[in-house]
Amino acid sequence: MDDHSPRDAAETPAPGPAATPAKRVYETPPTSRPITDAEAARAEKLAANEHIKIASGYLRGTLADGLLKHATGAISEDDGQLVKFHGMYLQDDRDLRPERTKKKLDKAYSFMIRLRIAGGVITPKQWLILDDIARTYAGGALRATTRQTFQYHGVIKSNLKRTMAAIDGALLDTIAACGDVNRNVMAATNPAQTGAHKAAYQLAKDISDSLLPKTSAWREIWLDGERVVGGEDEAEVEPVYGRTYLPRKFKTVVAVPPSNEVDIFAHDLGFIAILDKKNQVTGWNVTVGGGMGMTHGEPDTFPRTADVMGFVKPEDALKVAEAVMTVQRDWGNRKNRKNARLKYTIERYGLDAFRAEVEKRVGKKLGAPKPFTFTGNGDRYGWVEGDDGRHHLTLYVPSGRIKDIDGGPQFLSGLRRIAEVHQGDFRLTGNQNVIIANVPAEKRAEIDALVDEYGLTRGASALRRSSLACVALPTCGLALAESERYLPDLMTELEESLASHGLAEEEITIRSTGCPNGCARPFISEIGLVGRGPERYHLYLGAAHDGSRLSKLYKEDVAASEIRDTLDPLFADYARGRQPGEHFGDYLIRAGHVARTTNGPDFHDRTGALKPATLG
């Protein structure tokens, strides 16, 4: 695991083995709150989204009127930005675009709806309602995301309010699942650590509730609620966020070592549980400044792994979470959204200054970080008994797509039948899988019988168990290449290659995204594929197996048909030269195939293969 202890973030090594760290000069942090006046925003040339938020009336915009316009399945461009805060994206079926364009038809518009499910825990009753929604409004599919929640795809505009009412009926919502806010809060799911999971889940839920936008716009628009009377006083309507919310998305996770299945270093804010000998939480290490997204061809954008900023007692964790988020609210870049995430804020002003401001807002110093160790970021498949005697079954769900597959697993129907008899709860994992959790010992046989009856998968090959893919085409408007629809075929090819070198059971993380936004966190995967164009990908290698170190660009613009041939000699070399217990990403660096990435600022340095790879 790479060291993420606090350091002077200014000391960024230049390329080369003998480079001397150079002291960076940081900018002076701002001292004022974000601009909320329209004229001042124009004068300062703030990003377009800032103007939209200022004029939105706390996320209302013209959404209510737009829903009544039946001549189009879309909404206005400005409302398309605001609806994200309500948990939705306007999309269209890109497979149908050419034919519809030829016929001079409007795009096949629909909406993706994302739920807010802190910690990924839902009851069987909620599962059944979500299943009904999937069958009625979303083409018979639920999608477990890489951030422990569900998405619906293909919901048309005329069904939006009915869908939202059904979600509300499950005592769930979609508020802040997208947008410039604190999004769904993830929590560790390791079923063997029952006590620690309870603490992690509770912290995730507390943060989610505390940092939730307070505007009543969601209930007014989607559930026909009455507008709350009381004026537009910022302190009253949004006491934490203010009128303009955050500069950009903000993602929070809670991890429990030794498992890093939430990929804590890839997120803006994280809490790492520090456990005593009885597996009880004594406090939390706080991480800040992680994030995956970047833009092809723009080196001032980069992924970054989070720094461990300090240690807090359990009673201070919530105050620290709010302080970190509000510093980002006030310091984040509101002129350039490509440099607006917390990772860039810390690079701009320095970790020391950021920590000092957090401590000022909390009213006390953070403690020194406590030792911790992560050993991987995968799930534990099959049955696991928790330390309270309850049982937990983790099912492998390819790319999180819960639907009935012709000639294959009947995920939607099978999990519905399980929900009808299950007495515990369900947990979604950050690896897009489902845990049937808290099963009494006497109910295991009944669950097993249903799993077998519907062909549900308890596991898969080592490579597939360690895989993630974003949705990409046909619904994501940002996708440059296939991801979810392509990765299974690629893994079949790579499984053959790995088996030929005696590596069939070697755990190697592989992740694919259709664009460099990195929703499946490819830049902390030992093999990362990032869409560059139709059937072309950038290939990234050399990340840490536990998600603690970024990868490096190994080869640009690789044709899909060439990926196996590119990786095969590297697999051969790994099989010949690895040390006991050495992971693929670590070996590629030690053997000199690819340079080590220290952190975000040097992500674009020393790219490419450092030496030829051969089979012989």
Curated annotation (Swiss-Prot):
According to its UniProt record, the EC number is 1.8.1.2
* Cysteines joined through disulfide linkages: none
> Which SUPFAM superfamilies would you find in this protein's record?
Nitrite and sulphite reductase 4Fe-4S domain-like (SSF56014), Nitrite/Sulfite reductase N-terminal domain-like (SSF55124)
Which residues are siroheme-binding?
519
Q: Which GO terms describe its biological process?
A: cysteine biosynthetic process; hydrogen sulfide biosynthetic process; sulfate assimilation
Q: Where does [4Fe-4S] cluster bind?
A: 470, 476, 515, 519
Q: Keywords for this entry? A: 4Fe-4S, Amino-acid biosynthesis, Cysteine biosynthesis, Heme, Iron, Iron-sulfur, Metal-binding, NADP, Oxidoreductase
What is the reaction catalyzed? hydrogen sulfide + 3 NADP(+) + 3 H2O = sulfite + 3 NADPH + 4 H(+)
Q: Which biological pathway?
A: Sulfur metabolism; hydrogen sulfide biosynthesis; hydrogen sulfide from sulfite (NADPH route): step 1/1
List the biased-composition ranges (Low complexity): 11-22
One Pfam match, given by its short name, reads NIR_SIR
Keyword check for Protease = no
Bound cofactor: record note: Binds 1 siroheme per subunit.
The ranges of region (Disordered) come to 1-35
Catalytic class of the enzyme: oxidoreductase
Report biased composition (Basic and acidic residues) as residue ranges.
1-10
User: Cellular component terms, GO, for this chain's entry?
Assistant: sulfite reductase complex (NADPH)
Would you identify the family this protein belongs to, as annotated?
Belongs to the nitrite and sulfite reductase 4Fe-4S domain family.
The UniProt function text for this chain reads:
Component of the sulfite reductase complex that catalyzes the 6-electron reduction of sulfite to sulfide. This is one of several activities required for the biosynthesis of L-cysteine from sulfate.
Looking up NCBIfam families in the UniProt record yields: CysI, PRK13504.1
Q: Which HAMAP family match?
A: CysI
Q: How does it assemble?
A: Alpha(8)-beta(8). The alpha component is a flavoprotein, the beta component is a hemoprotein.
Q: What is this protein called?
A: Sulfite reductase [NADPH] hemoprotein beta-component
Organism of origin is: Methylobacterium radiotolerans (strain ATCC 27329 / DSM 1819 / JCM 2831 / NBRC 15690 / NCIMB 10815 / 0-1)
The record's gene field reads: cysI
